[in-house]
Amino acid sequence: MQKKRKMTLERRHNLTGWAFLSIGVILICWTSFYPMIQAFILSLKSGLGVNLKFNGFSNYARILKDPTFKGTLFNTFFYLIIQVPIMLTLALILASILNNKDLRFKGLWRTCIFLPCATSLVSYSMIFRSLFANDGFVNTVLRAVGATPIMWFSNAWTARTVIIIALIWRWTGYNMVFYLSGLQNIEYSVYEAARIDGATPRQILFKITIPLLKPTILLTTITSTNGTLQLFDESLNLTNGGPGKSTMTMSHYIYNTSFVQSPNFGYAAAMSIVILVMVAVLALIQMKVGDER
């Protein structure tokens, strides 16, 4: 009898737990998975505006032949390969400097470095457009030192460089906070013991700091990769995809396909699904590599 009562009590607790959990599961399914399913169904249709008809996987076949999509894919991965490693390396260096217990005004430096990511996307894009304008601050400095001014937004490579600089400026401080939090969880006695044993700063960095920060580095790598693959604001507000479409990202192209050109929601949805698959595959690869190391 007592056993039955105990089992009933446990079952009640389990049911209560599942009842609370089910609310969150339903909300996640409704706000995340249901829109994904609808987007996939939409990607199987074609037509302009709301006049859509089912056409199978023709939108996906079109993606393989679309030169504009290939160009935006190249641009997006160019930003990813160049910007993410530089940004995360700078974030780790800054976090290591700010973790020094002898450094004065730590709070001030942390705030100053973190502040860019709290800036409005539109306002910071306008600031960078002004800085790199033909008569902007950067060209003024170049003239002052006797160098030739650069028409930053008239050339594809220099325009891409401006976007990369802007991304690094904005997001380095954000990732630095993660690294700083991880460093502060490492006992200072570990570093002291390493120094007593004669370890050099390079050995401390590669043998102690980076291995102990591996979960944090993996997290920032995945989030930064996902964010860059979905990059939109800088492409739109800084260069508007120009010159031509040489700096346009995949998300910017999806936006133009949906709302700027003749609206083709089916094709835009197909490109969105492709980005989703890329994000998922890269995240799985990064997690697999992180686990092996």
Where does each model-flagged region fall?
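A structural signal for multi-pass alpha-helical bundles of membrane permease subunits
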Residues: 4, 9-293
